């Protein structure tokens, strides 16, 4: 305060800034500070983006004035030069290495992902692994209509990964942690969900419950209930878990817009969210991504353009029709899984699918006996 009072130019600030206000700023600084390079880079990108938008807007206004000035001739070059200057100034492209300088590193990464005949971590469904696996930097999405077992599929994947000693973060917009706990214990014990939640189980089953709770305590697993996803909270949660507990796989249940605003805004928001998970989290951090998305009654992924643009693989979960169950046989299960988009392997034709067995009471998915495709005459 003495320094501020010593100069006429700064004296007015001594009346505004009290010791208490300065202390408040100091206390807040720790909360506002960024504690990792990635978080700092994210803020820098936001600042540069705002600066680029400001300068681009100002240049475009000048270009607009040129277009309205009939005395100006041959304005194309002037407009091109003005826009090019802005694009060059804010270009984020660093030195671009030649392919010969990166091929050895890339091939080493390919080799590092090879294990037990698969690239990456296999799913619990052997036939699905012939099409795609769980890989760092990739985002695998299960799609299904509402209330058709998307969340239960993700839970099954999570447990299978925990059995493989993977570190898993499960971000849930559907179930709070209490309800999720009931589901995962029903899955692990094989006790029907209704009996488990109402206490209608035997002493032997109670022992099984305690055993599975004890096992879960040994796993590297975090479940976070976030009713409404937003990019900053998701990114912060992932970084915190990665730093404090380690993280191999991120599971997102599920990808959807906030529903606020008009349909276009929600659509754009969803696109940015999926892009952030695929590129900023899975890509930049080297984390495997699994998620779920809503499908329409016609078997299409809702907002498919935005999701499909970023997803590595999309697999559709559907009920088998009574005719399909009769034709395939009951031993071939009651669900079908179709790989409808795949950047890491083959896709299925319209009549192809993987046969699964689904028991909603026990929160269980298993691969069933695979059906023999039949050609109708």
Indicate residue ranges for each PLM-predicted region.
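Noncatalytic partner-interaction/assembly domains of nucleic-acid and motor enzyme complexes
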Residues: 1-50
């Amino acid at each position: 305060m003495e320094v501020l009072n010593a100069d006429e130019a700064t004296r007015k600030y001594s009346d505004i800034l009290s010791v208490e206000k300065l202390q408040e700023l100091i206390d807040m600084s720790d909360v506002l500070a960024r504690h990792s390079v990635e978080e700092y880079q994210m803020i820098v990108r936001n600042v540069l983006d705002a600066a680029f938008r400001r300068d681009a807007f100002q240049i475009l206004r000048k270009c607009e004035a040129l277009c309205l000035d009939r005395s100006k001739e041959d304005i194309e070059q002037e407009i091109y030069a003005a826009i090019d200057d802005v694009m060059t100034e804010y270009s984020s492209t660093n030195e671009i290495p030649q392919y010969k300088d990166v091929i050895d590193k890339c091939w080493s990464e390919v080799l590092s992902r090879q294990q037990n005949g698969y690239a990456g971590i296999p799913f619990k469904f052997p036939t699905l692994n012939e099409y795609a696996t769980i890989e760092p930097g990739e985002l695998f999405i299960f799609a299904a209509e509402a209330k058709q077992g998307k969340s239960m599929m993700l839970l099954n994947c999570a447990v299978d990964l925990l059995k493989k000693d993977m570190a898993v973060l499960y971000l849930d917009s559907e179930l709070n942690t209490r309800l999720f706990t009931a589901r995962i214990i029903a899955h692990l014990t094989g006790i029907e969900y209704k009996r488990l939640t109402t206490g209608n189980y035997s002493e032997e089953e109670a022992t099984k419950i305690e055993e599975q709770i004890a096992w879960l305590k040994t796993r590297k697993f975090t479940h976070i209930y976030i009713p409404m996803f937003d990019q900053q909270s998701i990114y912060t949660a992932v970084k915190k878990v990665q730093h404090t507990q380690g993280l191999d796989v991120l599971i997102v249940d599920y990808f959807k817009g906030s529903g606020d605003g008009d349909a276009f805004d929600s659509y754009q928001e969803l696109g940015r969210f999926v892009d952030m998970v695929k590129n900023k989290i899975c890509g930049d951090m080297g984390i495997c991504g699994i998620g779920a998305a809503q499908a329409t009654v016609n078997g299409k992924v809702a907002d498919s353009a935005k999701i499909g643009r970023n997803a590595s693989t999309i697999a559709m979960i559907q009920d088998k029709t009574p005719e399909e169950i009769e034709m395939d046989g009951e031993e071939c299960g009651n669900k079908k899984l179709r790989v409808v988009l795949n950047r890491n392997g083959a896709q299925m034709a319209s009549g192809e699918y993987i046969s699964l067995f689904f028991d909603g009471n026990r929160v269980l998915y298993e691969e069933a006996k695979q059906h023999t495709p039949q050609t109708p005459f």
